[in-house]
From Swiss-Prot:
It comes from the Eukaryota. Pfam families: RRS1. The gene is rrs1. This is Ribosome biogenesis regulatory protein homolog. It is found in: Nucleus, Nucleolus. The keyword Nucleus applies. Involved in ribosomal large subunit assembly. GO terms for biological process: endonucleolytic cleavage in ITS1 to separate SSU-rRNA from 5.8S rRNA and LSU-rRNA from tricistronic rRNA transcript (SSU-rRNA, 5.8S rRNA, LSU-rRNA); ribosomal large subunit assembly; ribosomal large subunit biogenesis; ribosome biogenesis. Residues 161-187, 236-266, 290-317 are annotated as: Disordered. Residues 161-177, 236-245, 290-311 have a biased composition (Basic and acidic residues).
Length: 317
């Protein structure tokens, strides 16, 4: 099947002739994200006379301009239908979640990167000369296994009376134990990089007591939910607080689908922008400032230990 690319602007006038917008197009388009931005100023008189009608008319015209611009893009015909070839996105959209962190490198990976050593993939099968067949390179019944030989060549460094087979087995056990130690060391180093508190001794002075208490409460809350019933049928300790209820986080106003509520919120926002009165709540700001000062004075008294107050009281007596 041959793929044909046609220009949708050729059929735009035939299909949407009665819905085209007359006037200058001042929108900024990002067709890759299917969005358009209107930076023109609002007409205050029309907005104050009928806000809802003005917002609806402006939104309808802008959406129609966006659709008209989309129809000017080339279209690719495939078996399932027609596809518009969108350009590259120009507006950066923030990520929903943070960027994934790279996995910490092991000691060998860091050493190989410095030395420029590249890992070569070794074949899983190897030719066994004795049995004249291909066998696994490692593991059970591996090829050219020295341990299966009934005779071994003597070496100059062999000691008299030493069992070469026993020596070979001991060397293998030593290599395995050393490899396990290296794996454990790499695991500890990687976990130390991920958790900054690992390896640090706890300090029970006054400065760290609050942090230690909050950490213990978090650990206790996690332990209460670690059973199969999520702590529902566990025995409760005397004066034990209920476990915190963790609900689903929801971003209010995003994708709710309530068009009327969204338009009402937008109209309220525009009303606040065009208000002549100051939006700042002076009483609320004053109360917050006074509370901040009281909190700061209280923390200063706690840090000084209240020695000045005690000395003043003694002097008065």
């Amino acid at each position: 099947m041959t793929e044909e690319i046609v220009n949708a602007s050729d059929i735009l006038t035939k299909k949407l002739d009665g819905h085209l917008i007359d006037g200058e197009d001042t929108l900024l388009y990002d067709l890759g994200n299917l969005t358009a931005f209107d930076h023109s100023s609002l007409n205050k008189t029309e907005y104050k006379s009928n806000p809802n009608e003005y917002i609806n008319k402006l939104s309808r015209d802008n959406v129609q301009l966006l659709i008209s611009r989309l129809f000017q893009l080339p279209i690719k015909e495939i078996e399932e239908g027609s596809l518009a070839l969108l350009p590259r996105c120009t507006t950066p959209i923030p990520r929903e979640r943070s960027l994934p962190t790279s996995k910490p490198k092991t000691r060998w990976e860091a050493f190989a990167e410095i030395k420029g050593i590249k890992k070569k993939k070794k074949s899983s099968m190897e030719w066994d000369k004795e049995h004249e067949e291909y066998r696994p390179t490692f593991g059970y019944k591996k090829a050219n296994d020295v341990a299966n030989d009934w005779a071994m060549l003597a070496r100059p460094d062999d000691k008299v009376g030493e069992d070469p087979f026993k020596k070979l087995e001991d060397e293998k056990n030593d290599r395995v134990s050393k490899q396990k130690k290296r794996e454990q060391r790499n695991f500890d180093e990687a976990s130390m990089r991920q958790m900054s508190n690992v390896g640090k001794t706890l300090s029970f002075d006054k400065e760290h007591r609050g942090q230690i208490k909050s950490d213990m409460e978090k650990v206790f809350d996690v332990a209460k939910l670690s059973t199969a019933s999520l702590g529902k049928f566990d025995k409760r300790v005397e004066n034990e607080k209920d476990a915190p209820k963790r609900g689903k986080k929801k971003l209010a106003g995003l994708g709710a689908g309530d068009v009327a509520q969204e338009s009402e919120n937008n109209s309220k926002l525009i009303d606040r922008m065009f208000k002549k009165e100051n939006v700042l709540n002076v009483d609320k700001a004053t109360r917050q400032f006074v509370k901040a000062e009281e909190r700061e004075n209280y923390s200063k008294k706690r840090s000084s230990g209240g020695k000045d107050n005690k000395s003043q009281k003694r002097f008065k007596k």
